[in-house]
Amino acid sequence: MKSCRTLIFVAIILNGLSTFVAHAGAESKVHIVYLGEKQHDDPEFVTESHHRMLWSLLGSKEDAHSSMVHSYRHGFSGFAAKLTKSQAKKLADLPEVVHVTPDSFYQLDTTRTWDYLGLSVANPKNLLNDTNMGEEVIIGIVDSGVWPESEVFNDNGIGPVPSHWKGGCVSGENFTSSQCNKKLIGAKYFINGFLATHESFNSTESLDFISPRDRSGHGTHVATIAGGSYVPSISYKGLAGGTVRGGAPRARIAMYKACWYLDRFDINTCSSADILKAMDEAMHDGVDVLSLSIGYRFPYFPETDVRAVIATGAFHAVLKGITVVCSGGNSGPAAQTVGNTAPWILTVAATTLDRSFPTPITLGNNKLILGQAMYTGPELGFTSLVYPENPGNSNESFSGDCELLFFNSNHTMAGKVVLCFTTSTRYITVSSAVSYVKEAGGLGVIVARNPGDNLSPCEDDFPCVAVDYELGTDILLYIRSTGLPVVKIQPSKTLVGQPVGTKVADFSSRGPNSIEPAILKPDIAAPGVSILAATTTNKTFNDRGFIFLSGTSMAAPTISGVVALLKALHRDWSPAAIRSAIVTTAWRTDPFGEQIFAEGSPRKLADPFDYGGGLVNPEKAAKPGLVYDLGLEDYVLYMCSVGYNETSISQLVGKGTVCSNPKPSVLDFNLPSITIPNLKDEVTLTRTLTNVGQLESVYKVVIEPPIGIQVTVTPETLLFNSTTKRVSFKVKVSTTHKINTGYFFGSLTWSDSLHNVTIPLSVRTQILQNYYDEN
């Protein structure tokens, strides 16, 4: 059995619905057989070698072909096949096989965004116009498909398809290849892994389409944010009005549908075998950026684990110069929940915009309170207001908890606006409360809760308004102060700019990285709350095919759009250089210079575990001055440092590898961040900077040390010229703390007259190692 640190291919727990029967009657399930770097350039030869391996195992060519689910033959070598446990073990024991693992399932994790980030078309000299809006760049998206009729995929004024494109569009149910154009240049679907497990999936009864066509709207929304064309005069029933467009509005979109809608569960699910096939095809087709708003439920798997499928596919993509952008997950605000943590992936957190939807609530004492809602119905004039509680002389059951409103009798809530309190920030709490009140004949709901970022319209445009506990208590005190409390609720308004502050979203998954704590995740943050973009026309709450959605799923394509522009401007930059440019130039405040907070309980100032380097600053990222670059040798150093065995590394990279003894330190991995999770004794680490700015330049170091941490940099000045383009420096770090601490944060900046190249410092002192303190 190979080491648990062996480099492997990804999959996840199979749900056991597959009933394929092998020779001995044992249950067969889809397994992914990972063979590492492909040994031949001819994809047909690679696939034939996969069939031969299966033929040798199963005994006949027919069985080999019927067992095969996918052949991975472009970016790497491997295949997915239906195998019994014993068959999988026989393959795993072959020397040419890196690993075999069962298939598994992943889940799916803008009118204002781009102006907010400074990418306005009104400025003739900016990144957007300097790159012709990304016209020669191809953004590949692995998601739930595409709704090709949406206006955001119009190709008005767009030139010929880029010459490096090798892909195409595949016809299927309710989708023909003719629906592609010079904007939507690719559309494929991958369902074999899904069908092998969900054999009961009935295409005639399912709401999904066995084609690239989107059912859920998620993929269409993501594609809009990354590279949608201009569509003017869009709003949601009058809210958030403006022009919808993507970050790179002339970039080309290639959709790879690998996520499928399960009607009985009302969810999208994505087979790891299908995800890998989609990534493999995208590498072959010639995409420049790969965007995946897909994640796996916690706990996560290291990139050395077979189940970390996206990490494995992403590694091969990055080696081919393709930047891979992934959502960080929606499991916040708890710490150590960030996903997609492989160090070659650009992992994205979600923030709010400088936009809100204040909703006037007027009490009977004329006090005005501004709640938050997406209420676009008519004004609800002064109406009875109630908080269900026992007045002291009743045997009835009362509850003012939003989750328990069903305990109240109908006459308690009928014809009234109901105030309730909840500790939850999840939208399901609001929707449940609305359902209870509507069934009882109520006319509206005011929900008092912790601050959250899950604002959505309520069904049938029912008045449902969120307030915090302080304002909720003000309303409750008013109710208790009078015998006939009343309230008026007016439609929501759109407020843009100051005084609306930027926050890291409550749901956005947080660091530190639970897999490899020395690798900072997330890398960067971008708007992902209440983003208005295209969807399918059958979606609830859509207005003319546009909808508000929130999630790191929306933040990731924002970064993908920025990456597309940077790729158009700097064709020779590696994925690591692009990541560095984005991270080192990010705002640590909002665009107006105000501090960024992180939603949670309690709300706090954001730190690198909330937003990585900060909020993306596209204009600055275009001219970073210096970058922390990475190449194959750096990735090999990283793999050696975290314990990959040499055989696995060799198979992965396609050439012999020998790790040094002693093994290198992961702290020397040339990331645009420094994270030390277990500082006890003094450590010295190395970073290397590459000049991508002015040929003759001088940079001086500026250090903001974490509290109680001593940081020394040598040398303090870096000189670049025509012969010196790469310079290394050493960072010596020690602690003055005498106890185990939490993380403290600082920064290290290299500055000249034009650039500030900043990386976050995150340091935790651990005098007693591997110790968990619950005091």
UniProtKB/Swiss-Prot annotation:
UniProt domain Peptidase S8: residue ranges: 113-622
Signal sequence, renumbered to the chain: 1-26
Domain of life where this protein originates: Eukaryota
Segments forming domain Inhibitor I9: 30-108
Documented EC number(s): 3.4.21.-
Top-tier EC class: hydrolase
Protease listed as a keyword: yes
Pfam families: fn3_6 (PF17766), Inhibitor_I9 (PF05922), PA (PF02225), Peptidase_S8 (PF00082)
A Gene Ontology molecular function term of the record: serine-type endopeptidase activity
Alphabetical UniProt keywords: Autocatalytic cleavage, Glycoprotein, Hydrolase, Protease, Secreted, Serine protease, Signal, Zymogen
Keyword Glycoprotein: yes
Glycosylation: residue positions: 129, 174, 202, 395, 410, 538, 645, 721, 756
GO biological process, one term: proteolysis
Gene Ontology CC, one term: cytosol
Active-site positions on this chain: 143, 218, 553
Main location per the UniProt record: secreted
Domain PA intervals: 384-476
CDD domains (UniProt xref): PA_subtilisin_like (cd02120), Peptidases_S8_3 (cd04852)
Proregion positions: 27-109
Annotated PROSITE patterns: SUBTILASE, SUBTILASE_SER
PANTHER family named in the record: PROPROTEIN CONVERTASE SUBTILISIN/KEXIN (PTHR10795)
Family under the similarity heading: Belongs to the peptidase S8 family.
Protein name, as recorded: Subtilisin-like protease SBT3.8
